[in-house]
Amino acid sequence: MVKETTYYDVLGVKPNATQEELKKAYRKLALKYHPDKNPNEGEKFKQISQAYEVLADSKKRELYDKGGEQAIKEGGAGGGFGSPMDIFDMFFGGGGRMQRERRGKNVVHQLSVTLEDLYNGATRKLALQKNVICDKCEGRGGKKGAVECCPNCRGTGMQIRIHQIGPGMVQQIQSVCMECQGHGERISPKDRCKSCNGRKIVREKKILEVHIDKGMKDGQKITFHGEGDQEPGLEPGDIIIVLDQKDHAVFTRRGEDLFMCMDIQLVEALCGFQKPISTLDNRTIVITSHPGQIVKHGDIKCVLNEGMPIYRRPYEKGRLIIEFKVNFPENGFLSPDKLSLLEKLLPERKEVEETDEMDQVELVDFDPNQERRRHYNGEAYEDDEHHPRGGVQCQTS
């Protein structure tokens, strides 16, 4: 039992979520609310990052489950939170803040794919927007010699203010220079490049051809090195494509295996059957249960080499795992005469010798809501005992 569920609610998962479920939830939400895509959702992005940072760490998660957010803030497991952008970059392969300072930003894009795409392989063309160095000014932002050191911050890009917080006590506050927006240099408006307006970069449309190999998995990353955002003086970042698999109507993927449920009738469970299955590469395979091979409700069987292709070994495949659900006939489907005949064909049932000490009882259908109603009525009854309702008072003379 967890103390609170706030972090789980932020990620939209249950408290018993697996690490894979946490990763999938974070991936979708982080891409949706990233500041580059949603500039007004900075606080939401921060909450998502904090929730994932705690729940992805087994020690922090255990501490949170026992003591809630307060236990994390008190530092019982290395308290405090990392930068949301660092968490994002580490998750998507960006390398963290130090590497980000030497390179342009990575562009991360989620690509929706089907299970058929991952089974057969596919090629998709994807149009993206990215920053490129302005070719008109060659990334200077203006005319040659027009760029000058910002006199306000002396080229550091940062301002330092001293704030007195008490007698003999001062606080040093560092913030981005408003004059140069943190660049450490400025360009006179008349000398700015007309193409990029002094920003040194422009937005450009990029068409990528994304090759999805057989056996790739949900959440797998395809990286286009050096194709990300460009910035003057920095190496270009990467474009990272993250595969997001849609749910399939029939099959569920479990590693290299495919899992499915199959309904069969009672006669098929007892007497055998043949069932066709349409595969993800548009073949039809037929599974056979021979007469005399009893298939019980909940039995699990498999077909070898009919699962997912193994990544980079596409001629090898996992298993197709099938769980059988036996559908029983409705009450009264046989007349008494035929029922008697069926009984003679089936294995003999064990008769119970009744004694006088035994009580005869009757089976009825179970109603799961009945207990809830009884529980509710019981609470209401107890409440009446503790807080009697006021009735009409008899007048006494």
Swiss-Prot record:
Quote the Gene3D superfamilies the UniProt record gives: DnaJ domain, Heat shock protein DnaJ, cysteine-rich domain, Urease metallochaperone UreE, N-terminal domain
PTM Phosphotyrosine: at which residues?
381
What is the topology of this protein in the membrane according to its UniProt annotation? Lipid-anchor
Organism phylogeny = Eukaryota, Metazoa, Chordata, Craniata, Vertebrata
The record's annotation in Pfam families points to:
DnaJ, DnaJ_C, DnaJ_CXXCXGXG
| N6-acetyllysine PTM positions | 66
Task: State whether keyword Cytoplasm applies.
Answer: yes
Please state where this protein is localized. Membrane; Cytoplasm; Microsome; Mitochondrion
Q: Which GO terms describe its biological process?
A: androgen receptor signaling pathway; flagellated sperm motility; negative regulation of apoptotic process; negative regulation of establishment of protein localization to mitochondrion; negative regulation of JUN kinase activity; negative regulation of nitrosative stress-induced intrinsic apoptotic signaling pathway; negative regulation of protein ubiquitination; positive regulation of apoptotic process
- The UniProt record gives the binding positions of Zn(2+) 1 as 134, 137, 193, 196
Gene behind the chain: Dnaja1
| Biological source species | Rattus norvegicus (Rat)
| Annotated positions of the Cysteine methyl ester modification | 394
**Chain spans, region Disordered:** 352-397
What is the official name of this protein in its record?
A: DnaJ homolog subfamily A member 1
